[in-house]
Amino acid sequence: MRHGKKINHLSRQTGHRKAMLANMACSLIEHKRINTTVAKAKALKQFVEPLITKSKEDTTHNRRIVFAYLRSKYAVTDLFRDVAAKVGDRPGGYTRIIKVGNRLGDNADMAMIELVDFNELYNGGKKEVKKAKSRRGGKAKKAEGTAPEAPAAESESTTEASE
């Protein structure tokens, strides 16, 4: 009987599941956002959040524990250097799962999992600037009105300089 065992096996054996979650966690740390199925995203959230909590305290012991799970020294370095600096004051909830619809091939529920504090990497460059709407004849009138003022200002400054 499997009373009280809440792990989602994801239809995989233990070694395959651990390797898949380690690879997905490395990709999440590297890219800060990945697309996957909802079930894998929920399993990845349970896998990676304790590792991010350990990365907040940079000790050799914590680095070795995290490396035992991730198996990638580049991901461990990135986690302890960049991610831990951003989430230092956050008490938990480092990831966000957003459902994005169904996959075309097999209609599986898809989700995007991302690190919460790294949202500006994707949304920072998309600031919308409203353009002022003008009529066709508006520019010609403004150009005619500003043209005589500029030489008059220059002539006043030249007379002041000559005196």
From Swiss-Prot:
InterPro entries: Ribosomal_bL17, Ribosomal_bL17_CS, Ribosomal_bL17_sf
Protein name: Large ribosomal subunit protein bL17
Regions that span the bilayer: none
Compositional bias ranges of the Basic residues kind: 128-140
Keyword Ribosomal protein among record annotations: yes
GO MF annotation list: structural constituent of ribosome
Gene Ontology annotations for the cellular component aspect, listed alphabetically: cytosolic large ribosomal subunit
Record family assignment: Belongs to the bacterial ribosomal protein bL17 family.
